[in-house]
Swiss-Prot record:
Coiled coil: none annotated. It is found in: Cytoplasm; Nucleus. GO terms for cellular component: cytosol; nucleus. Belongs to the GTP cyclohydrolase II family. The keyword GTP-binding applies. It catalyses: GTP + 4 H2O = 2,5-diamino-6-hydroxy-4-(5-phosphoribosylamino)-pyrimidine + formate + 2 phosphate + 3 H(+). This is Probable GTP cyclohydrolase-2. GO terms for biological process: riboflavin biosynthetic process. It comes from Schizosaccharomyces pombe (strain 972 / ATCC 24843) (Fission yeast). The lineage of its organism: Eukaryota, Fungi, Dikarya, Ascomycota, Taphrinomycotina.
Length: 326
């Protein structure tokens, strides 16, 4: 190893130590962007009749270790307050999120006492009970509430309330760029509406853009779709699985949030099986369908492309949803 390579390895290890992430995340040598060859260019003609390969989605052999590093209150434009929890894990180097509705659901890893931390440290990272206000001194004592963290958790356990949960993968195009190619943005909004009506629940927001292939590959897939392929064919032409996502991190996050029994908002049967974990650490007691708003006679996304997208999910990916008659 020459000096330059040695300096790069030292830099990678130092960065990973700062992030508290495993070294194998950065074990592969980085290449300058000009030296990277495009290895995923489609080698087949568009619009071929391709059978999907087995998906990567499935039950993990082990669950990753997760840790909630910060929690913050977010007032929303809908009037509902949520608590945004940011997680790190030993499976990937992404910052996954838990959008928590209500104050009954708490993170065990967040509430755990860290060596040497002060009361201010705990409040700054969100490990407090009740609400923050100017002049507050203790993370454990809120003058507006007499309940401790453990009392809040015990109260939640006694209610036997099974929360609504949505496992949602990031979709920049559908959530931010107003795309009518998919209904991801609508599903996220609808999940938030349903959970806020009940008062307590969780949206696990995974950074798995494009069913796990990333935004750049997803945009290539869009171009292949414009050439006549459906979403599954486009992924396969780019040498990706039809669905490359993993839900192991989501399972571990739910466990950290104390949610062992859930009602899952999904049309995807593979997600139901995967989220329960290798040893049934989480139990899906009910699956609740996510029916497009326009299919229910409400104002929602109306485009030929979103219909084809959903039709492909039903016919090629086994999603449990009935196409409308018209």
């Amino acid at each position: 190893m020459d000096k330059k390579e040695g300096d790069q390895v030292h830099h990678d290890k130092t960065l990973l130590q700062d992030l508290s992430l495993p070294e194998n995340v950065a074990s592969e040598k980085r290449l300058p962007i000009d030296d990277v060859q495009c290895v995923n260019s489609p080698m087949l003609s568009p619009a071929l009749d391709i059978e999907p390969k087995p998906n990567v989605v499935g039950t993990a052999e082990r669950l990753p270790k997760v840790r909630c590093v910060v929690r913050a209150r977010i007032p929303t434009v809908k009037g509902t307050e949520i608590f945004l929890h940011l997680y790190k894990n030993d499976f990937d180097n992404k910052e996954h999120l838990a959008i928590v509705f209500g104050q009954q659901i708490r993170s065990d890893s967040l509430d755990a006492v860290q060596e040497g931390e002060t009361e201010m440290d705990r409040m700054v990272r969100g490990a407090y009970v009740g609400t923050l206000y100017p002049g507050r001194k203790s993370s454990y004592i809120d003058v507006n509430s007499s309940k401790t963290t453990e009392e809040q958790k015990e109260e939640a356990r006694k209610t036997n309330f099974v929360p609504l949960v949505r496992i949602h993968s990031e979709c920049y195009t559908g959530e931010t760029a107003w795309s009518a190619r998919c209904d991801c943005g609508e599903q996220l909004d609808e999940a938030a509406r349903l959970i806020s009506e009940e008062g307590n629940g969780v949206i696990i927001y995974l950074r798995q853009e494009g069913r796990g292939i990333g935004l750049s590959e997803k945009l290539k897939a869009y171009n292949l779709q414009d050439l006549g392929n459906d979403t599954v064919q486009a992924n396969l032409l780019l040498q990706h699985p039809a669905d490359g996502r993993s839900y192991a991190v989501a399972t571990a996050m739910l466990m950290d949030l104390g949610q062992r029994d859930i009602r899952l908002l999904t049309n995807n049967p593979e997600k139901v099986n995967s989220i329960e974990g290798p040893n049934k650490e989480v139990r899906v007691v009910e699956r609740i369908s996510m029916i497009p708003k326009s299919w229910r006679g409400e104002k929602g996304i109306e485009s030929a492309e979103v219909v084809l997208y959903l039709k492909t999910k039903i016919e090629k990916m086994g999603h449990l949803l009935d196409l409308p008659d018209s």
